[in-house]
Amino acid sequence: MERIVLFLAIVSLVKSDQICIGYHANNSTEQVDTIMEKNVTVTHAQDILEKTHNGKLCSLNGVKPLILRDCSVAGWLLGNPMCDEFLNVPEWSYIVEKDNPINSLCYPGDFNDYEELKHLLSSTNHFEKIQIIPRSSWSNHDASSGVSSACPYNGRSSFFRNVVWLIEKNNAYPTIKRSYNNTNQEDLLILWGIHHPNDAAEQTKLYQNPTTYVSVGTSTLNQRSIPEIATRPKVNGQSGRVEFFWTILKPNDAINFESNGNFIAPEYAYKIVKKGDSAIMKSDLEYGNCNAKCQTPVGAINSSMPFHNIHPLTIGECPKYVKSDRLVLATGLRNVPQRETRRQKRGLFGAIAGFIEGGWQGMVDGWYGYHHSNEQGSGYAADKESTQKAIDGITNKVNSIIDKMNTQFETVGKEFNNLERRIENLNKKMEDGFLDVWTYNAELLVLMENERTLDFHDSNVKNLYDKVRLQLKDNAKELGNGCFEFYHKCDNECMESVRNGTYDYPQYSEEARLNREEISGVKLELMGVYQILSIYSTVASSLALAIMIAGLSFWMCSNGSLQCRICI
């Protein structure tokens, strides 16, 4: 009995000095997905998917957009009378055009290679309008009567501001031969047109000559157009049509015009004074007096995140568009407060801290650390070195992911004419395919990195555990839950030496050996006592059973229930 009491006293004494290795926990409810699991609660996480915008059109890097309101690009460049506010425009960061602007080609017709012209604008930030052929220089032709009720201004007939519709003068239309030399250092955008009358009577009334042409030539262009006279349905009250053309005139090049009728001559041209990243965006939004780095048709984005799911079309320094609803990177640990007392699952990359059944909410100044208890008390202490290394590693990884993904990335709608619908459909399918690939890559990246991060934390906890185990050796007992029981007294100074890696094993080894042997001896003696008691119990119970059987047999024989015969 004295041995048992001594054993219990020793066990009680040793249990009072313990050190445990554990990790931080908090009240976070943030969840992430990994390759192996979904909705894993973690202590810290970082969202890398931007989902919000401001619903406005903003300046990009301080430069306002050119918002054409009810005008189209064609209406702006040709000078539709209803677009006079855009006759001279400052530098723009991008151009905004509505889906179906009402002020486009007021006189019905067509704009040749219109989609290519819009593509040109995607690399232009500023035009300077200059006069190349003054209206007053057409002394042999009528340069003021070429107007139409289809292009009204202040209740009167008018025409496009930047071109001149030349008609006969004094019943004559002399052949035009006019040249312009580009002496500027910049490229010039030049526009002109040809008129297609409704019938022969209109042809001779306007131009006198029944058979006419318009010829244009530069060092790279050789074009000859002939009017097509035909009866057509009226559009905007007009049966005639106009067809507009454009070209880029390089510095030191010349453009030559020759025509004997139906010529719509250029008065102004556009000097391309600044090239850069621009685009034409389809949107009905108004300017919001704001500044941003990234613009979408539904609003501006101000974000450093690498991905967004707001709109596939963007302009500026934008995150990459993905179709995902959620992309969250784990930056902290699995959040398993100790009260839950459930074992952690092991991950794909070898999560190895599953022997610890919960985190500590009491440890707030680090991710990994210690809890000790001895005669002087108990407390938590973070291992700041391993915590800082982990923070630096994860921060660098997150920043690396963001830097690699968050490059200047923009995608704008491409323009196709009616003859290119199959190309447009193919282009849309290809873009959808690219978006699917981007989305898959982004989601897989997040799942893989989250798995690695959580396993990285588990590995750090295990490394801390091994650091303590290798120091203590047989001076302490592993309890299997991340804790060690000392076989010797370990005061606060001793605990600190374990934590900082300076534990003096020889100093405590003799005390630990004696306590360990004492506990082992008590265990052996108790085991011998238990064996004697078990033998005695077996013999006694067998003897009692034999006596009971003999008594029962005697009783049954005496009352005749059992016949007993003894044969010799």
From Swiss-Prot:
Site (Cleavage): 346-347
N-terminal signal peptide: 1-16
Disulphide bond pairs: 20-483, 58-290, 71-83, 106-151, 294-318, 490-494
Positions bearing carbohydrate: 26-27, 39, 181, 302, 500
Topological domains, Cytoplasmic: 553-568
Molecular function, one GO term: host cell surface receptor binding
Positions on the Extracellular side per record topology: 17-531
Membrane-crossing segments per the record: 532-552
Modification after translation: Palmitoylated.
Top-rank taxon, per record: Viruses
A Pfam family per the record: Hemagglutinin
Membrane topology: Single-pass type I membrane protein
Subcellular location per the Swiss-Prot or TrEMBL entry: Virion membrane; Host apical cell membrane
S-palmitoyl cysteine lipid attachment residues: 557, 564, 567
One GO-annotated biological process of the protein: fusion of virus membrane with host plasma membrane
InterPro entries the UniProt entry points to: Capsid_hemagglutn, Hemagglutn_HA1_a/b_dom_sf, Hemagglutn_influenz_A, Hemagglutn_influenz_A/B
Keyword list, A-Z: Clathrin- and caveolin-independent endocytosis of virus by host, Clathrin-mediated endocytosis of virus by host, Disulfide bond, Fusion of virus membrane with host endosomal membrane, Fusion of virus membrane with host membrane, Glycoprotein, Hemagglutinin, Host cell membrane, Host membrane, Host-virus interaction, Lipoprotein, Membrane, Palmitate, Signal, Transmembrane, Transmembrane helix, Viral attachment to host cell, Viral envelope protein, Viral penetration into host cytoplasm, Virion, Virus endocytosis by host, Virus entry into host cell
Gene3D superfamilies for this protein: 3.90.20.10, 3.90.209.20
GO cellular component: host cell plasma membrane; membrane; viral envelope; virion membrane
Function, in words: Binds to sialic acid-containing receptors on the cell surface, bringing about the attachment of the virus particle to the cell. This attachment induces virion internalization either through clathrin-dependent endocytosis or through clathrin- and caveolin-independent pathway. Plays a major role in the determination of host range restriction and virulence. Class I viral fusion protein. Responsible for penetration of the virus into the cell cytoplasm by mediating the fusion of the membrane of the endocytosed virus particle with the endosomal membrane.
Additional facts recorded: Major glycoprotein, comprises over 80% of the envelope proteins present in virus particle. The extent of infection into host organism is determined by HA. Influenza viruses bud from the apical surface of polarized epithelial cells (e.g. bronchial epithelial cells) into lumen of lungs and are therefore usually pneumotropic. The reason is that HA is cleaved by tryptase clara which is restricted to lungs. However, HAs of H5 and H7 pantropic avian viruses subtypes can be cleaved by furin and subtilisin-type enzymes, allowing the virus to grow in other organs than lungs.
Family recorded in the similarity comment: Belongs to the influenza viruses hemagglutinin family.
Quaternary state and interactors: Homotrimer of disulfide-linked HA1-HA2.
Protein name per UniProt: Hemagglutinin
Gene encoding the protein: HA
